[in-house]
């Protein structure tokens, strides 16, 4: 399913004709340039590889420079892939723009969530706190029991505990497209999308729409 790579600009709001305020996230989608077309015969699957934005010449590695030169496209800030469905065809060097979403109502947005560092179980997993009084000493935000006794004699894998929070790939599904601004290469998406301002996001037509 083909999507677009964009950059999260921030949030604002737009008004409907009857004065209702809609909170929207602005995603800037510069032209996505096709840098490679993968086929079933040569790669074992059908997909296109795209790049967007720009990268300083001294930041482009030699293998990357050769790859972009072969495709005849300007070096971008990264490389992403979209699987192709039967009948979809693209040429190397062609460009994908926000107009791809002119007829799309709902999208899934994938980004990297904001990193929160090392956090306790209350913030990370929404555990309830223990009693503030009634004899409790120094265990107000402690997680409590983490298992049983001699049987099984271990802590089960996946046990919710304190640890590194955020900075992981997150997808928010079924977000509504409020406006497609082809002139300024902007997508206005209702609600919040994952990640910090300036982060890369992948916008695809919703799978559950």
From Swiss-Prot:
Disulfide bonds: none annotated. GO terms for cellular component: cytosolic large ribosomal subunit. Coiled coil: none annotated. GO terms for molecular function: rRNA binding; structural constituent of ribosome. GO terms for biological process: translation. Keywords: Methylation, Ribonucleoprotein, Ribosomal protein, RNA-binding, rRNA-binding. InterPro entries: Ribosomal_uL3, Ribosomal_uL3_bac/org-type, Ribosomal_uL3_CS, Transl_B-barrel_sf. Pfam families: Ribosomal_L3 (PF00297). Methylated by PrmB. The modification N5-methylglutamine is found at residue 150. The keyword Ribonucleoprotein applies. Belongs to the universal ribosomal protein uL3 family. Part of the 50S ribosomal subunit. Forms a cluster with proteins L14 and L19. One of the primary rRNA binding proteins, it binds directly near the 3'-end of the 23S rRNA, where it nucleates assembly of the 50S subunit. This is Large ribosomal subunit protein uL3. The lineage of its organism: Bacteria, Pseudomonadati, Pseudomonadota, Gammaproteobacteria, Vibrionales. The gene is rplC.
């Amino acid at each position: 399913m083909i999507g677009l790579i964009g950059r999260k600009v921030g949030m604002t709001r737009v008004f409907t004709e009857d004065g209702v305020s809609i909170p929207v996230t602005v995603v800037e989608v510069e032209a996505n340039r096709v840098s490679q077309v993968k086929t079933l015969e040569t790669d074992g699957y059908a997909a296109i590889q795209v790049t967007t934005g720009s990268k300083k010449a001294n930041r482009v590695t030699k293998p990357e420079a050769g790859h972009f030169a072969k495709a005849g496209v300007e070096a971008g800030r990264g490389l992403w892939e979209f699987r192709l469905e039967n009948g979809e065809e693209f040429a190397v060097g062609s460009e994908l723009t926000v107009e791809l979403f002119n007829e799309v109502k709902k999208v899934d947005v994938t980004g990297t969530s904001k990193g929160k560092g090392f956090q306790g179980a209350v913030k990370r997993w929404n555990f309830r706190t223990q009693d503030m009084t009634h004899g409790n000493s120094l265990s107000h935000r402690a997680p409590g029991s983490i298992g049983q006794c001699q049987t099984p004699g271990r802590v089960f894998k996946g046990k919710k505990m304190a640890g590194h929070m955020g900075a992981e790939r997150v997808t928010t599904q079924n977000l509504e497209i409020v406006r497609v601004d082809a002139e300024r290469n902007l997508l206005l998406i209702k609600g919040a999308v994952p990640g910090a301002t300036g982060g890369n996001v992948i916008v695809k037509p919703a799978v559950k729409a």
